[in-house]
Amino acid sequence: MIAGTERFTFGTRGKGTYEITQEVQACVDRAGLEQGTATIFVRHTSCSLVLFENADPSARTDLHGYFDRLVPEDAPYFVHTYEGPDDMPSHIRMALTRSSEVIP
């Protein structure tokens, strides 16, 4: 079995969803393999990976709205607010999603 590791960083403009398909595909292409799996992992505690519809931008809008209602910022019941009003909601959203994906 052949295995390789490649790491890339991805800058953001703050809270939101970001398309990283091209970056992941470039890593796979550089590996030069015809078949296998890619494991994608994010190292930040308030960041997650979601495999999601990207053809219609309204799908992202709905996802954002759902999480905003499910885990609102500035909720009076959050105790962990030292790093700002969005920090605890970000951690909860990550716990409800995933920090890694394995893609064939």
Task: Put a short name on every predicted segment.
Residues 1-104:
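Active-site histidine-anchored catalytic micro-motif
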